[in-house]
Amino acid sequence: MVSIIEVTDKAQLRRFVDYPNELYKDVPQFVPATYGDDLSDWDRSKNPAFEYCDARCWLAMRNGEIVGRIGAIHSRKANDKWGANRLRFTQVDFIDDPEVSSALFRTVEAWAKELDCTAVHGPLGFTDMDREGMLVEGFDRRSCFFTYYNYPYYIDHMAALGYAKDVDWIEELITVPEDEATIQRWEKISDFVLKRHRLHIHEARNRLSYLPLLKPFFELVNLAYAPLYGTVDLSDRQIKKYSAKFAPLINPNTTCFVMDENDRMVAFGVGAPSLASALQKHRGRLMPTGWIDVLKAFHRNDTVDLLLIAVHPDYQKKGVNAIILSKAMKGCHKLGIKQAETGPMLELNDKVQSQWKDFQTEQHKRRRCFIKQL
């Protein structure tokens, strides 16, 4: 017998957040989210998204043990933007038992009907900066620290529950060129584009010098990502929140902010050495000692995670991405990085995918947003 309990206190929330560590404890491909970030996302006093969202989360219990979890988010801002009253499901995990998955989704769908929603879709977060998409290909590959991992049986459960594909994201593994001729060729292209469009790269020796750029960075995120599935503009409070979250991840060697002649940001690329091993070792916890291994990962690593990349609409199709890629290539070469892993890219987003066409790549993962009409 499965019982569903709503998470209403901090002790239950800690169990909700920590459950994936138990479910995937023997799975080397699973990488936990940072524990503190997951906790704060559900805290109304710390997450500005609650200004326009309602959210609830539940645990599935059997014989006193957790056998599943699920969250749900009603984003009025997203529904207004996209013209559809939908409920998002998020952070869903469960054992391979249809009774459990059915009980979890029935609970979410019941709330959706109370809200007069026409559909349930996900997994999606409060914003596009959160984890999203259920893994449907690439189960043998280790996740990035900012993406979900799930068992293959989830797909069958979703189909049995009446959920179908809405959109897919793909991820690429890119081999970093090591030959000097390729690096120099990209540097020449970068120099040409910089001169032609009177642009320059914001040079910085450390993370602190990037801090004043984080607000215009997220303002450009709002502009460039606006047409993408499920996105909503980040508010000033959210920009402040995500700036604090992103600042420690910025590595000057693998980060590029491109500015125009008036020092306005026109493009960016942010990469960070992979934190997967460090977070696995400490179950997503930075304290008391997890932060030490995170710092080590920044200095000794063979993989860089490409977190975000975008170009202002006025500068698209002008070769500006070559500036970002050239700097990233040189930075990876300096750090001994052998491969780069992209974040999820919408499968129909040709603008983003086309920038990897000159590199040796492997599409190694695919994740999906499911939807069910009510």
Tell me the role of every PLM-derived stretch.
Residues 2-3:
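Extreme N-terminal starter segment of soluble prokaryotic enzymes
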Residues 10-13, 32-44, 51-72, 82-84, ...:
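Catalytic cores of nucleotide-enabled group-transfer and carboxylate-activating enzymes in metabolic
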Residues 20-62, 70-80, 204-309:
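A conserved beta-strand-loop-helix scaffold within acyl/acetyltransferase catalytic domains
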Residues 80-162, 232, 282-358:
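Acyl-donor binding region in acyl/amide transferases
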Residues 121, 173, 257, 270, ...:
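Short beta-strand segments
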